[in-house]
Design a protein with these regions (language model features):
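Positively charged, polar, low-complexity stretches
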Residues: 1-99
Length: 99
């Protein structure tokens, strides 16, 4: 299973997350950089299986990126093993793993 990590020490805002996501998954410039486009890509366009891990996510970042986190949690359920989504807090300890 491929693993793709998003380091929130380097991602300060939502537009930066979308740019990083598009780069890591080699999406073309037509990627909409919004929740609907992200859902479409995650559930239909990226190679599965894949593990996506958010690292260095503090409480403030969890609030800022809450909708994106929820999207990945829902996609993890929908894809039934095709996607594993994890969050590691700033301490390095796993904060979330359901897969």
């Amino acid at each position: 299973m491929a693993k793709v990590e998003f380091d929130f020490e380097q991602i300060q805002d939502v537009p930066t997350f979308y740019r990083d996501f598009a780069h890591k998954f080699a999406l073309d410039e037509g990627f909409g950089a919004n929740l609907d486009a992200l859902w479409d890509v995650v559930t239909g366009d990226i190679g599965l299986p894949v593990e996506i891990e958010f690292t260095h996510l503090n409480a403030r970042s969890k609030r800022r990126f809450g909708a994106i986190i929820l999207l990945f949690e829902e996609a993890e359920e929908e894809l039934e093993g095709g996607l594993r989504f994890n969050i590691r807090e700033s301490s390095g300890e796993p904060a979330h793993h359901r897969g």
